[in-house]
Amino acid sequence: MHIAAVGRALPDHFVDQETLIGAFRSAWAARHHNVARIEQLHRNAMVGGRHLALPAEAYLTLDFTSANEAFVRVATEVGGRAVMAALEAFGAAPTDVDAIWFTTVTGVAAPSIDARLVNRLGFRSDIKRTPIFGLGCVAGAAGVARAADYLVGHPDALVVLLSVELCSLTLQKDDLSIPNLVATGLFGDGAAAVVLTGASRSAVGPRIAASRSVFYPDTEDVMGWQVGSSGFRIVLSSEVPDMVRRHLRDDIRAFLADHGLGVPDIAAWVAHPGGPKVLEALQEELGLPRAALQRTWDSLAAVGNLSSSSVLFVLADTLADPPPPGGWGLLIAMGPGFCSELVLLQW
């Protein structure tokens, strides 16, 4: 199985981080005793700006209903652009696609967004669809792995993974908790699509050599949503960097060792930009220089954390500047559960 192409799409509305800091400062100054703390948390995210599903002023009056209506509309539009960008990069048409996986954690739709795209883009009526909700930030890597699992049994197939995350639409204006203050400075909106091909097709792009899912028991409270009348309220523990130190380091080493590899053998680190503390922990625990994760740092600075779409943005940048033939890569993400997903690639 191979990753043949990645397409990206971003909403048209872009706001730089300093402007967003000013907007949140104005909105929360009367209710938060330490406005400087809000500014500090947002600057610590090391994000330069973010794309938004809606014009900034529209968020002042959003409720759960209007936010989710916007999600369905915008997700269909940017998701369609991402899919077409990926297919065009590979030289395929929607009618060539045999199956599609769709993942999101920032809105709800039934029919799901992938179903709406069958009509909008002209997929075949016999396309196999798998919409996924709840994996959060890990879903980009997990989606690649699950699509590859499918291709083992369907070596002639061409499939698409689509991730759309419109994190801004989950804004909780009345939540002044530290997790929400961190989230409002970190997360942005975007979509990414991956074209994958089975082993019987002509090889294009890196080979998916193996994958591994790891679930950490009794960690449901590390990350996720508390869903209520106002929508999705974030659950985000300060333990996430510690999960890297306690678990992910050893999981990565064990996974690589099972394939006769070690950390020095990895030429391309395709890591989800979970935030500065998470990336610093990953670098420290694996003994990596910052340059090894530079694409991830650059993506974080450019567009923020796009949840499941982010690692696919980093993957797109890696495909544009790949390691030499035969070089190894490792796709890494963590998310609600708490869990991690590792995908071993070879160019």
Language model feature labels by segment:
Residues 45-123, 129-134, 263-279:
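Conserved beta-ketoacyl condensing-enzyme motif
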Residues 105-107, 116-119, 124-126, 131-152, ...:
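Claisen-condensing/thiolase-fold acyl-transfer catalytic domains that form or cleave C-C bonds
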Residues 109-116, 160-182, 210-229, 250, ...:
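Active-site-adjacent elements of ketosynthase-type condensing enzymes
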Residues 125, 132, 142-146, 166-189:
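Active-site glycine-rich loop that binds ribose-phosphate moieties when present
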Residues 1-74, 173-246, 250, 254, ...:
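Condensing-enzyme catalytic core mediating Claisen C-C bond formation in acyl metabolism
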Residues 94-98, 125-128, 153-159, 181-182, ...:
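Short coil/turn connectors at secondary-structure junctions
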Residues 43, 47, 74-90, 113, ...:
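Short, well-ordered amphipathic alpha-helical segments that serve as non-catalytic structural scaffolds
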Residues 5-7, 103, 133, 158-165, ...:
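Short beta-strand segments
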